[in-house]
Amino acid sequence: AKSVSSSNAVMAKEVYFVAKGFNISMYETIFKDGQLIHAMFYSVYMTMIFTVLGLVVCTCAAYPLSKKRLKGRTFFSFILMIPMYFSAGLIPTYLLYKDLNLLDSMWVLILPLIFSPYNMLIMRSFFQSSIPDSLEESAFLDGATNFQILFRIVLPLSKSIIATLLLFYAVGRWNAFADAQYYITTKSLKPIQLLLSDFERGRV
């Protein structure tokens, strides 16, 4: 409602659920600005890459950890869950990205976050509770490999969890703001969220 209300009504805090003083000048300004249009398509493109890579990494980690036959799976699960509880801090992280030449690039917003311990835990739990071992054992007896079982049996039966995590990854990346603010300085590489913030502050 505020986006199509007059600035006077917004500043006076008169807008709640219904627009007052209908005004679309802000939308006209945004869509006439080539930078914002570019940032929107760039953000969609980056979110798609992030979501696909995140699902691939999450699946590759969760599937083997869901199998009882994997030796040391408890240890590996513990190691992979550590980032969920501890963070290196902003300055060490910034220096690491600098040494890896990731600063001011699209990949600094993708690679560090494609592995999510939380999403991996959800997918691992789904595999353990919803995919019976007998189904995979039957496939092994028929000569199927681990990859064939994963792609031809497990993933087709896991559409619900894949759709859920796809939503988690996509919404999480789309709403992320702080990392772009810390690590991106080039305007053409800024996602739409950061550019809109700059636009609001009069920096564009």
Regions found by a protein language model. Give the residues of each.
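A hydrophobic, multi-pass inner-membrane permease signature
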Residues: A1-V204
